[in-house]
Amino acid sequence: GFIAIPATLALAILAEPLLVTLFQYGAFGADDRFMAAASLRAYTLGLGAFMLVKVLAPGFYAREDMKTPVRIGVIAMVTNMVLNMLFVFPLMWWFEMGHVGLALATSVAAWLNATLLYRGLHRAGILVLEASAKQWLIKIMASAAVMSVLLLQITPEMVIWTEWLWWERGITIAMLCLAGLAAFLASLWILGGRIDHLKR
């Protein structure tokens, strides 16, 4: 689950380069890319929560408790609907970006879902974070920060991306992903983390 931290940051930073590489040909212009990137970044904020829900929910199923995850899911769904109205209209009114409100509401509701699932397992004494897990989380966050700084420094300006052909964009995206991954793993190694720990 910790891998969601670097994945979230990388996707947020590379949102526009990814979109320009995949879609900005012909009628798909700079404004479309900007709007889509804003929505993608809002969804990205919930990436960790989406992963946690998939990990935490089976903890209830293993105890033959089918009702709690469903009840929590309903709470998250209702919250999502309420947040849609709270986010969409202000963003549409002030920034003409109501679609970002939909994505943001989904991410917030996902975090609520994950938090309630974790609280349920924690109260039941099934899931307790040990000190080693907290230390590991700090190492992951520090390594992800190093990766983010590198990506922000080496990612070309968007005006350059639009001048490239599709294969030039693709190669650059691949190189950026590899560079970010290398920076993350190297930083993690220096801090005492090991790759096999990511499987935990």
Language-model regions, residue ranges each:
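Membrane-embedded alpha-helical bundles of multi-pass transporters/translocases
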Residues: G1-R200
